[in-house]
Design a protein with these regions (language model features):
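Glycine-rich, charge-decorated loop segments at or immediately adjacent to ligand/cofactor-binding or catalytic sites
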Residues: 43-47, 136-148
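Short, acidic/small-residue loops that bind anionic groups at enzyme active sites
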Residues: 63, 119-141, 155-156
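Glycine-rich beta-alpha loop segments
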Residues: 1-59
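Acidic/glycine-enriched connector segments
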Residues: 44-103, 107-108
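A charged, well-structured terminal subsegment
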Residues: 98, 150-182
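Short catalytic-loop micro-motif centered on adjacent basic/acidic residues
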Residues: 34-38, 101, 129-130
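Glycine/threonine-rich flexible loop motifs
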Residues: 14, 109-112
């Protein structure tokens, strides 16, 4: 199963978030998953890469020409360079069976919203799990509730993804859906 992990590349973030990346990616690599990610060697993204390397899993990184220099640190994966972030998002989506969204910044939000919209508009059944430990995504989820209340989106938007609050919930959700995905 190819799992697309969305997360941060910023080193300045709290180590707490990096520990989430290590825990989740270690669990996935131990459960015979392969990694699809926006090829970056730093912070949460780099930690995910390292955990999958340790388990000799297949790794597929996608990046744009602006970040191609970082690929020299990602020697254990197949690297794909796409001209735009639009192409990058599409190829990561198409090459994954499951999407796991960890805490992240504007790139992570952009990817998450793109994949929710792709699922909503094109009836994709690809699972999306938002890992909301420490209530990181509370304001995002509140914004979606406001959009529903103001009738900008239907309430079924919340059916496009699953929210988990900790590693235990994540593992349970993963095992429940594992048989339903490649």
């Amino acid at each position: 199963m190819n799992v697309l992990i969305l997360s941060s590349s910023r080193e300045e973030i709290d180590d707490y978030y990096k520990s989430i990346a290590r825990s989740v990616s270690n669990f996935l690599a131990n459960n015979d998953c392969n990694l699809v990610f926006g090829g970056c060697s730093s912070s949460m993204m780099g930690i995910c890469y390292e955990e999958f390397v340790k388990k000799n899993r297949e790794i597929y990184s996608f990046t744009t020409p602006n970040y191609v220099d970082d690929l020299k640190y990602l020697t254990k994966c197949k690297n794909y360079i796409r001209e735009t972030t639009f192409e990058l998002k599409q190829d990561m989506f198409n090459n994954s069976d499951l999407i796991v969204c960890l805490p992240g910044g504007i790139g992570t939000y952009s990817e998450l919203l793109s994949y929710i919209e792709e699922k909503r508009s094109n009836s994709s059944d690809k699972p999306i799990i938002i890992y909301d430990e420490n209530n990181f995504y509370n304001k995002f989820l509140k914004s979606l509730r406001i959009l529903v209340k103001e009738k900008f989106v239907d309430k079924d938007i919340f059916e496009m993804f699953t929210v988990v609050k900790n590693r235990e919930q994540f593992e349970k959700k993963f095992y429940n859906m594992k048989g339903k995905v490649k």
